[in-house]
């Protein structure tokens, strides 16, 4: 009898590790599936942002330069109104959710509405003033400013490789600018201000999303809502509203289509920016934007109509583009290695707990 009890006891002890091992395998499989889904969502968000960002630059350039629409402010105003209208209808139909307006909302959103307004208007002004290749190469400065913003606001650090590739992009931009025959001081000033505001906006969006107070739809809605009246007032007092009303192209169906698309794309780009920042990071969003700019650079050279070719400018553009590609590769590689290391640490901790 004693022998039988000993055998049963040994069998039970032998089964425990097997069960533990099975549970651990199931946990690893579940984590792997979740990680695959997360990577897919990250790529989807990044791709959505890249396509949206590409389309809005092309459409805005067509409206402001090809059709010579006189008011960048009114284009920005149209984008704000479209954003508020779409999200208001979405909330009424219960497709999206975000908190109702109360006296605490301005505090929760600040300073994002101001950054959003400045980012949008300076982006439109610089799109109008600069040819597409120089517009895109000067946007490389947004990566440098994003690094500073994330370092200050989010306490992030960056590797030597990242810093060197950013340096290469900036050098390329300086080389290209040194022989830009279509140089426009106003355009250069607007694009550099836009770079600073883009960096600050990306870092603050990440910070606000992490706090989970308003959510991505709330941030989009209130950013646009709070800046409609100030933008309308500025457009009225500067005479931009009058110029827009007197514009002769309103009878052109193709112009109307592109103007409407520009307004709607403003909302889509805002949503894509927040989505990409939420699933990835402010820096990744900036990287995707710069990769998109590579395509715009070459398209702008051939089809833009306002690019003046010089070898120095062309070489500078390509130095900056090469830096962008290497930078993107290093950043994504480092991010994946970091996440893999974190996942392995979690598995090790769970494995020890199971044993």
UniProtKB/Swiss-Prot annotation:
Q: What is the effect of changing residue 65 to P?
A: In SHNKND; loss of transporter activity
Point to the regions of Basic residues compositional bias.
1-11
Protein function = Antiporter that transports nucleotide sugars across the endoplasmic reticulum (ER) membrane in exchange for either their cognate nucleoside monophosphate or another nucleotide sugar. Transports various UDP-sugars including UDP-N-acetyl-alpha-D-glucosamine (UDP-GlcNAc), UDP-N-acetyl-alpha-D-galactosamine (UDP-GalNAc) and UDP-alpha-D-glucuronate (UDP-GlcA), which are used by ER glucosyltransferases as sugar donors for the synthesis of sugar chains of glycoproteins, glycolipids and oligosaccharides.
Protein name, per record: Nucleotide sugar transporter SLC35D1
Give an example GO biological process.
Answer: nucleotide-sugar transmembrane transport
- Name the gene: SLC35D1
Protein's cellular compartments: Endoplasmic reticulum membrane
Give the family from UniProt.
Belongs to the TPT transporter family. SLC35D subfamily.
Principal subcellular localization: endoplasmic reticulum
Q: Name one GO molecular function term.
A: antiporter activity
Query: What is the membrane topology noted in the UniProt record heading this document?
Result: Multi-pass membrane protein
| Membrane-traversing stretches | 37-59, 69-88, 158-177, 187-205, 217-239, 254-276, 281-303, 308-330
Instruction: Give any Pfam family that matches.
Output: TPT
């Amino acid at each position: 009898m004693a022998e039988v009890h000993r055998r049963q006891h040994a069998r039970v002890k032998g089964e425990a590790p097997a069960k533990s091992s099975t549970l651990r395998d199931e946990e690893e499989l579940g984590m792997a599936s979740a990680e695959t889904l997360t990577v897919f969502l990250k790529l989807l968000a990044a791709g959505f942002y890249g396509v949206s960002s590409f389309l809005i630059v092309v459409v805005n350039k067509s409206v402001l330069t090809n059709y010579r629409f006189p008011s960048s402010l009114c284009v920005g105003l149209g984008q704000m109104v479209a954003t508020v209208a779409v999200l208001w209808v979405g909330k009424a139909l219960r497709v999206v959710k975000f908190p109702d307006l109360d006296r605490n909302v301005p505090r929760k959103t600040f300073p994002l509405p101001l950054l959003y307004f400045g980012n949008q208007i300076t982006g439109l002004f610089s799109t109008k003033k600069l040819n597409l290749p120089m517009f895109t190469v000067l946007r490389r400065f947004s990566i440098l400013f994003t690094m500073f913003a994330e370092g200050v606001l989010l306490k992030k650090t960056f590797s030597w490789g990242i810093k060197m590739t950013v340096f290469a992009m900036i050098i390329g931009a300086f080389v290209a600018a040194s022989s830009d025959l279509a140089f426009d001081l106003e355009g250069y000033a607007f694009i550099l201000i836009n770079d600073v505001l883009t960096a600050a906006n990306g870092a603050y969006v990440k910070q606000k999303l992490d706090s989970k107070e308003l959510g991505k739809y709330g941030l989009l809605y209130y950013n646009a809502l709070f800046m409609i009246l100030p933008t309308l007032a500025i457009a009225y007092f500067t005479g931009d509203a009058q110029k827009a009303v007197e514009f002769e192209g309103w009878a052109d169906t193709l112009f109307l289509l592109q103007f409407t698309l520009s307004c709607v794309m403003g909302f889509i780009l805002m949503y894509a920016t927040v989505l990409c920042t939420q699933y990835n990071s402010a820096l990744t969003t900036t990287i995707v934007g710069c990769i998109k700019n590579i395509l715009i650079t070459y398209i702008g050279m051939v089809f833009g109509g306002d690019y003046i070719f010089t070898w120095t400018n062309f070489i500078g553009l390509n130095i900056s583009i090469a830096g962008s590609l290497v930078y993107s590769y290093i950043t994504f590689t480092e991010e994946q290695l970091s996440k893999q290391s974190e996942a392995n640490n979690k598995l090790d901790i769970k494995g020890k707990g199971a044993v």
